């Protein structure tokens, strides 16, 4: 009889986004999404955080493809209104999608997209 091993505990997933300018990306996330600027390493890598969410940035090199992330929002209306008031680039407005989620899309200055949603 085989015995299943329990997995060791791991922490949260931290996305690393490709950006054209790390410091500019940090400032953009601070100003339009209310993240706090974290560390910066020689202009090549850096981080921001908000609550339990952290994002790393790395200066992009070809070939480049933007990243997509799904972000659950407990209060989707408040999140939408907050980000809209901050001037976030909302490329798809808040609406109920055919697949049942209420969601909206924010695109950052480097084309990375965030699908904010609530079930």
Model-flagged regions — what are they?
Residues 36-67, 113-118:
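Conserved short beta-strand elements that form part of the metal-binding/catalytic scaffold
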Residues 22, 69-113:
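Vicinal oxygen chelate
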Residues 13, 44, 67, 100-102:
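Residue-level marker for the onset of beta-strands and adjacent loop->beta junctions
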Residues 1-26, 67-69:
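N-terminal beta-strand motif that seeds the catalytic metal site of vicinal oxygen chelate
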Residues 16-18, 98, 116-119:
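Short beta->alpha transition motifs characteristic of CBS
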Residues 31-38, 88-89:
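Conserved acetyl-CoA-binding loop of GNAT-fold acetyltransferases
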């Amino acid at each position: 009889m085989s015995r299943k091993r329990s997995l060791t505990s791991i922490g949260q997933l931290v996305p690393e986004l490709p950006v054209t300018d790390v410091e500019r990306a940090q400032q953009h996330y601070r100003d339009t999404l209310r993240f706090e600027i974290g560390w910066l390493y020689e202009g090549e890598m850096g981080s921001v955080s908000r609550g339990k969410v952290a994002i790393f940035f790395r200066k992009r090199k070809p070939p480049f493809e933007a990243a997509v992330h799904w972000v659950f929002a407990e209060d989707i209306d408040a999140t939408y209104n907050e980000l809209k008031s901050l001037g976030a680039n909302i490329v798809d407005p808040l609406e109920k999608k055919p697949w049942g989620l209420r969601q909206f899309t924010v695109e950052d200055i480097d084309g990375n997209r965030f699908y904010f949603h609530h079930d």
